[in-house]
Amino acid sequence: MNFGFLGTILTILLVVGFITNVVLAFVIIFLERDRRTASSTWAWLFVLFVLPVIGFILYLFLGRTVSKKKMEKNNGDELHAFEDLVQDQIDSFDKHNYGYINDQVIKHRDLIRMLLMKQDAFLTENNKIDLFTDGHKLYEKVLEDIYNAQDYIHLEYYTFELDGLGKRILDALETKLKEGLEVKLLYDDVGSKKVRLSKFKHFRALGGEVEAFFPSKVPLINFRMNNRNHRKIIIIDGQIGYIGGFNVGDDYLGLGKLGYWRDTHTRVQGEVIDALQLRFILDWNSQSHRPQFKFDQKYFPKKIGDKGNAAIQIASSGPAFDLHQIEYGYTKMIMSAKKSIYLQSPYFIPDQSYINALKMAANSGVEVNLMIPCKPDHPFVYWATFSNAADLLDSGVNIYTYQNGFIHSKILMIDDEISSIGSANMDFRSFELNFEVNAFIYDEDIAKQLRQAFEKDIEQSKLLTKKVYDKRPLSIKFKEGLAKLISPIL
């Protein structure tokens, strides 16, 4: 065996690996610095240093950013009307010329004004909201609304499993296709990894349209696996909408290994449907290879039915956005709280500024309550969540671990006045990497319903104390330390 030759090959590979690492480090530090937080940059440099070649491969799958141009393709001049609406609302707030009937709109005008800096986050009024915390009740209503649809049905989901629940919904959609309705389904290619377009052959033969978000172009390999569409929305006839945390699948009915699935979702009616419809059209056009999905008037009809009193903004965020509106909205709400804060999130891995905001609120006398799962669905994420939550104990934050199955709810509510419900977790992935959508709701009734639901959850939770946390074994401390170190890339 020619060991000299093998040594030469090994040397060449090491040199190539070193040069590749240096180039990639240069890209991360300088060329993508505007799209990354400092913690993310350091985390990736750590991975490259510890795992020179493997780190490069991981970066190809997990580290690349998303082009804003790609996400805004096919929309042309269609957005001008919404941009004008947002600018008019900004002007009215700047001139203190409100004209709104909802007291919470005036009281929290600073939050509203901030969210308006993204063109799809226009303020809507006269909205009716129904709250769901149980998957069975939610999807009974969803199926009823689908069967009652008259014109079109649009669905966008991170996970759309074709199991018992998924097949029931697909059957309902195919029934409406036979009646001549328009049906569009956008699912995430990684979140719905068991599903392929070929599974929708009959659905498409009936005239249904289906698209996968950032699909893999190479079998078993997806170079966009770290930037996923985590949104969960439905629009029916431009009159009814759904937004929240529930995906489609039997797991979300409590039939999976994690047991009972506790989540939060809303059914909405009113002006807010136009905002959900806009979000769907933008996302569909970013992925579809078909002719542009037009902003036809039929998708933004005059609203009928009972009017509610809630004001709502639909805020979106994602790696192609200049502003992280949901993260900003969460932080602004926390800093605005005067009496109480209620938080639920399955994954709690925010940056230090978010942690500090909660500490400052608690140290200022605000009652801060955080609820997280007692069991992991992703081990590293779980330990990072636990470690971050425990950091708040010294400030007097109440930390609850939910015991009755798995809590997947993503809500923030302050002062029994305003709340946020949607797909975004309180973590780096939701704030920086995934495409998310949340409803910021200015309505005391919904806020109080969320508090009541939280208090009911407390009955099935354990309070985490400093005394108990400090007694955790060394193995747990090691897991937490490692998970926290790599949390910016989890």
Curated annotation (Swiss-Prot):
Active site residues of this protein: 230, 232, 237, 408, 410, 415
EC number: 2.7.8.-
Principal location class: membrane
Topology in the lipid bilayer: Multi-pass membrane protein
Broad class of enzyme this protein falls into: transferase
UniProt keyword annotations, A-Z: Cell membrane, Lipid biosynthesis, Lipid metabolism, Membrane, Phospholipid biosynthesis, Phospholipid metabolism, Repeat, Transferase, Transmembrane, Transmembrane helix
Localization in the cell: Cell membrane
Alphabetized InterPro entries for the sequence: Cardiolipin_synth_Firmi, Cardiolipin_synthase, CLS_N, PLD-like_dom, PLipase_D/transphosphatidylase
A GO cellular component entry from the record: plasma membrane
Source organism, top-level taxon: Bacteria
Signal peptide residues on this chain, from the entry's feature table: none
Record-linked CDD domains: PLDc_CLS_1 (cd09110), PLDc_CLS_2 (cd09112)
Enzymatic reactions: 2 a 1,2-diacyl-sn-glycero-3-phospho-(1'-sn-glycerol) = a cardiolipin + glycerol
Alphabetized HAMAP family for the sequence: Cardiolipin_synth_Cls (MF_01916)
Protein's job: Catalyzes the reversible phosphatidyl group transfer from one phosphatidylglycerol molecule to another to form cardiolipin (CL) (diphosphatidylglycerol) and glycerol.
Sequence similarity: Belongs to the phospholipase D family. Cardiolipin synthase subfamily.
Protein name: Cardiolipin synthase 1
Gene behind this protein: cls1
